Amino acid sequence: MGRGNITEERQQPITNPIKEYPDCFGCGQDNPIGLRLNLRLDRDRLKSSFVPQKAHEGWPGTVHDGIITALLYEIMENLMYRQGVITMMRGMEARLRSPASVGKKLMIESWMEQRSGREISVHSELKDEDGKLIAQG
């Protein structure tokens, strides 16, 4: 799958796509312990970034795998919500490729791969600021 440079002009910021849920762990801006993701739509992909803090640590200096998985989950669920589809995740597979460092910016994106009836296949990737693949969902 090819990657291209993203220009600001094509991106549409989404302040909080689920306004009726300001305490959402992923995108809610009122949740003091949440991820507070700021989302932006780039054509058919939903993107965000996140800088993990000490509170998100597992092994010393490394982001907890549960936080990595939560980031993948949130970006996929929010993609569907943004497209007007309310979903219930039937299953999720997270492939952790490399450790992520606390304090280092992470880039997250999701896209719909396939839709067949009620079945929707959504994918996500999480990379560090240098472009290194951290995880896939």
Task: Show the residue positions of the predicted features.
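HotDog/MaoC-like acyl-thioester-processing domains
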Residues: M1-N16, A100-V102, E113-G137
